C-alpha cells in the first residue's frame, strides 16, 4: 500500500522555523511552495479556426492584438497556428474566463474574422520562457528625472522603489539545484493548471535560476493570471506552485525572508547601490489595501481608479469596491485623501511605492496544490 504523504504549505513550514520547531520538519514529506509576479516571458500558442478557407495567413490578431503566424502554414484550411506574447495579460485573462474574443486573419489582402472562445481553440497552450525567477531585485531612480518603466505603474521618481519576488515562498529559493536536470520533467501548477517544467528558462544560471514551463490554458483559473499596466506598457502576471520533497531540499527550506538578499539597483545601468533583504518588504506589511470610505470625496476623476494597474478599483453608487483582480501592488496609496492605505515597507531606507509580486495569490495556489496532492489529483 502506498504511503500517505504528509503535505504542508510553504508558509506552514516557515512558521516551524520561526517558532524554533525545526524537529517537526522531519514529519513532513512534501512542501508546496509558490510565487506570483510579473513574468514578461509568457506566450500563448493557439490553433485558431475561421469559418472561411484561405491560402495562408500573413497576419493574425486577437482583439486587435497582433500575434505571430506560426510555423505550420495550414494551406487552404482556414486555420492559423499563432503565437501571442507581449501585451497579452488582459487578453489571456479574458480567454481563460471564457469570454468571446475577435480573431482576425489577413490573407492575400483580404480580412477574415471570427468570434471565438477558448473552447473553440483545439490548442491553447501557455509557454513561459522565463518564469518563477529565484527572486529578483528592487529598482530605484537616482536621477532627478522621472522615468517610464515596466517596473512601476507610474513614472519612477527619485527617492522611491519598486520590487519583485515572493521571498521565502519562492520555489527556487527553497530548492537545492545543482544542474538543469534537477528540474526537467517535474510537475507544477501554472495558474491552477497542471504544468510540466521543461528546464531552465532564458538567462538562467545555477546561481540565478528561472524556469521554462508549459500548461494548457483551458485548465487555468483566471484569478491567477492577468494584465498589469505599467508606465511603459502592459505586462502579464502568473502564479506558480511547485511541490518540494523535504528530504531532498531540507536545508534550503529553512531560509526565512531575512536570509534572502534583495539587491537595490539603479534603473539606469542596473548597478547595485545597496543590498537589503526580503524581510524589509514582506514583514509587517499589508497584502491588500485598507479602505477608509468616509474619507472619499467622490472626485470626478478618481486617481486610484485611473491608475490601478489591474483595473481592480470600481466606484458603484458612491461606494468604492475592490475586486478580486487586486494585485496588492500598493499604487492606490496615491489617493491624496488617504482613502486607501497599504503598508509596503522599504528597502535600504527607500520606500516601496509599487509591488510587482503578490503573496496572497502565491499562498492561495500553494494551498490549492496541497489539497490536490492530498486528494490524489496531483501525482508527484
From Swiss-Prot:
Record's keyword terms, sorted: 4Fe-4S, Iron, Iron-sulfur, Metal-binding
Pfam families linked to this entry: HcyBio (PF01837)
InterPro entries reported for this sequence: 4Fe4S_Fe-S-bd, Fe-S_Ferredoxin, HcyBio, Methan_mark_16
GO MF, any single term: metal ion binding
SUPFAM superfamilies: 4Fe-4S ferredoxins
Matching PROSITE patterns: 4FE4S_FER_2 (PS51379)
Listed PANTHER family: 4FE-4S FERREDOXIN-TYPE DOMAIN-CONTAINING PROTEIN, ADENYLYLSULFATE REDUCTASE, BETA SUBUNIT
The protein, known as: Uncharacterized protein MJ1681
Taxonomic lineage: Archaea, Methanobacteriati, Methanobacteriota, Methanomada group, Methanococci
